[in-house]
Design a protein with these regions (language model features):
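N-terminal, positively charged nucleic-acid-binding surface of large information/translation enzymes
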Residues: 1-201
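Structured secondary-structure scaffolds
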Residues: 1-46, 98-102, 154, 170-312
Length: 312
């Protein structure tokens, strides 16, 4: 009988959990409980997603450090889930030392295999704030659907992933000034090189895992439309440092590091409960992975995260 590894999407730590968070958590909790009742050895992990511009901007609004904000909201999340009697085996955090260790190790593996490239690109820079405007630090009109308040990384209206430079009429989220393009260096994961492995994995996993139809269609669209190298670094202060010469002062993009939180939280559980996390994450013949996510998170869980694991 295979063991069952269950995850629910890591909620952003910048606010109180909403119904969308609870639906995923409750669904995963019901499934994990059913698995245990049927005799499956089950590990259910979740935790707060703590890095990225969502946290930085919220901390700036409240006049506290990102670390202080994360500590406060992590406990709010944990208390709400305790009230709902969610039976996590571990509810962790992506700002933990073990998360940094595993993310950097995976990056080094990808880099050693030639799957990381360096590119100098133009990004939006705010002269007033004296910083590059990554992700939520810039808002503007979506070039795909025309939504007037799209974020720099993703349009909340149509769900399309974006680059900040694609926005029409961009504005700095902090001071509302109009940013200007400026050159900066970033690191990219070579998704086209991983595509054959990803396609093979997706064809098998989507059938065996009973993927929802929208997950299959969205993933196939990403692959069909052509995978491109994707930036995995950001010009931010709050995040996991990039362990590569020439990239001091940069951190990993939150959607590169966040899904790895499932692994690091399992590792934290293993340290507390006396098991090796690799027995859950590196034993596909004996472990089945079940992930409960929202539709906005599909490509990160079916393309970006598995590509990181397959490539490393």
């Amino acid at each position: 009988m295979k063991r069952r590894l269950v995850t629910s999407a890591l909620p952003y730590v910048n606010n109180v959990p909403h119904l969308g968070n609870l639906i995923q958590v409750l669904s995963a909790d019901v499934f994990a409980r059913a698995c245990r009742l049927r005799g499956y050895d089950t590990l259910y992990v979740c935790g707060t997603d703590e890095y990225g511009t969502a946290t930085e901007t919220k901390a700036q609004e409240e006049g506290v450090s990102p670390a202080e904000l994360c500590g406060r909201f992590h406990e709010i999340h944990a208390e709400i889930y305790r009230w709902f009697n969610i039976a996590f085996d571990k509810f962790g955090r992506t700002s933990s030392p073990v998360q940094t260790e595993i993310v950097q190790a995976l990056f080094r593996d990808l880099d050693a295999k030639g799957l990381i490239s360096e590119q100098t690109i133009e990004q939006l820079y705010c002269d007033s704030c004296e910083r590059f405007l990554a992700d939520r630090y810039v808002r503007g009109t979506c070039p795909h659907c025309g939504y007037a308040d799209a974020r720099g990384d993703q349009c909340e209206a149509c769900g399309k992933l974006l680059d900040p430079t694609e926005l029409k009429e961009p504005k700095c989220s902090s001071c509302q000034a109009t940013p200007k393009p400026r050159a900066t260096k970033h690191l990219y994961i070579d998704l086209p090189a991983i595509r054959p492995q990803l396609e093979s994995w997706m064809k098998e996993a989507s059938v065996k895992g009973f993927w929802a139809n929208n997950a299959i269609q969205m993933t196939q669209a990403w692959i069909r439309d052509g995978l491109k190298p994707r930036a995995i670094t950001r010009d931010l202060k709050w995040g996991i440092p990039v362990p590569k010469p020439g990239f001091e002062g940069k951190v990993f993009y939150v959607w590169f590091d966040a899904p790895i939180g499932y692994i690091s939280i399992a590792a934290a559980a293993g340290k507390e409960q006396g098991f090796d996390w690799r027995s859950w994450w590196q034993d596909p013949d004996n472990v089945e992975l079940y992930q409960f996510i929202g539709k906005d998170n599909i490509p990160f869980h079916t393309v970006i995260f598995p590509s990181t694991l397959l490539g490393s």
